[in-house]
Swiss-Prot record:
Name recorded for this polypeptide: Kynurenine formamidase
Catalysed reactions, semicolon-separated: N-formyl-L-kynurenine + H2O = L-kynurenine + formate + H(+)
Summary of subunit composition and partner proteins: Homodimer.
Gene transcribed to yield this protein: kynB
Needed cofactors: Zn(2+)
Binding site for Zn(2+) 2: D56, H161, E173
One GO BP annotation of this record: L-tryptophan catabolic process to kynurenine
UniProt-annotated catalytic positions: H60
Function recorded in the entry: Catalyzes the hydrolysis of N-formyl-L-kynurenine to L-kynurenine, the second step in the kynurenine pathway of tryptophan degradation.
Taxon lineage: Bacteria, Bacillati, Bacillota, Bacilli, Bacillales
Length: 209
């Protein structure tokens, strides 16, 4: 039986990648070269946790919330469904009711609203808070989006973040979905084992099932 190849749905991390305004710019540099050390190249990485494709832990928006190492890593591995919700200003229960989501535990939303990893968007389609109980009723445990946040970029209340985690739904942001079709896939998007962190970069990959 032929096994499908894994497809990368992560934003490549490089010195040109966009970051949240005012956040730490991404930087990779060779701190010691092989010539200097006599044996190896050693790199230095500086970045915000919320750069590129990443997950949010509840501690990101709740001082009493779980940190990355407290999260159930099983949620970030397993069957997922990709659906198209492009050309919408916001996404909630009403927009998702037309999709068959019974039995789905992980859901990735393609908005196709912003495909430039080196430019931070001015506006994005966001999730409305009423999406959380709807997804929970369906048994969905992880929601992924192809934009930097599930909430509006200038929003301070973060209603979608709070409601999603209130309903035990994990958040994956900045996935790249324009090169993959709608359908069912196997997903791996494991966070790093960061003890006290409010989120983590991930290498998100999928393959058809």
């Amino acid at each position: 039986m032929k096994t499908s190849k894994w497809i990368d749905i992560s934003q490549p991390l490089n010195n040109d990648i966009a970051t949240w305004p005012g956040d730490t710019p991404f930087s990779y540099e060779v701190l010691w070269s092989k010539e200097e050390s006599g044996s190896v190249n050693v790199g230095k990485l500086t970045m915000s946790i919320h750069t590129g494709t990443h997950i949010d832990a509840p501690f990101h928006f709740d001082n009493d919330g779980k940190k990355v190492l407290d999260l159930d890593i099983q949620v970030y591995v397993g069957p997922t469904r990709i659906i198209d919700v492009s050309n919408l200003e916001s996404i909630g229960k009403k927009e998702l009711e037309k999709f068959h989501l019974e039995g789905v535990e992980r859901l990735l939303l393609r908005t196709s609203s912003h495909g430039k990893a080196n430019e931070f968007p001015d506006i994005i389609p966001h999730l409305r808070a009423d999406i959380a109980p709807f997804l929970s009723e369906k048994g969905i445990r992880l929601i992924g989006v192809d934009v930097p946040s599930v909430d509006p970029l200038d929003d301070k209340e973060l209603a979608a973040h709070h409601q999603l985690f209130k309903h035990s739904i994990h958040i994956l942001e900045n996935v790249v979905l324009d090169h993959v079709a709608d359908g069912d896939y196997e997903l791996i998007a494991l966070p790093l084992a960061l003890s006290d962190a409010d989120g983590s970069p991930v290498r998100a990959v999928i393959r058809p099932i």
